[in-house]
Amino acid sequence: PTGAMEMKSQREIHRVSPVCVIPDLAGEITAALAGTGPALGLGEVRSTSAPSHIALVIGTSGTTGMSKEVAFTASALLASARASNKFLGAQAGQQWSLFLPLTHIAAVNVIIRSMELGTLPIDLREHQGEYPQVDFTSIVPTQLFRALNSDERLLRHLQSAKAVLVGGAALSPALSQQAMTAGINVVETYGMTETSGGCIYNGEAIE
């Protein structure tokens, strides 16, 4: 009987392709968050099922270099997205752009933040040509460095955004200053996969 109960409390994990198109993935995320679809697996996820309250599993090497799987509940993911949008003063109808790979929690966060605003992010991962204008985006320091030193299209995109989250690695004071001088509103984020991504914005805990 105990084994049967444990089986009933599990849900399937559907592994998501890293090249999945955003509208399709948004539908899968909606179902995963609502509990009407399978949990989603991103990155190196070997597990095929998860406890029923888990909506997302991400395979990560973490800070130790050891491969592991990190699980997230729907409530944790939604709370993170809402706290981020609240900190940024985001309003319904505003839009994010996506530059980050779907193997990272930060990319999923961008999608859920957008969905909370009633929109979908503009997928710029493989974009060619001029970047469209958006309200918010999330990048890593190497992308910021590229924008400031060699990629004028990306620079214009970041300059036009209301806020640019920068995380995933340490942001040097020099690069931060260069971005500010260029007119980019950088919000430095700190967090780990285990904390649903960035939970500290400009040294302040978001809630």
Locations of the language-model features?
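Carrier-protein-dependent adenylate-forming modules in NRPS/ANL systems
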Residues: 1-48
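Hydrophobic alpha-helical segments in the ANL/AMP-binding
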Residues: 23-31, 36, 84-85, 103-117
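Gly/Ser/Thr-rich phosphate-binding loop
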Residues: 150-205
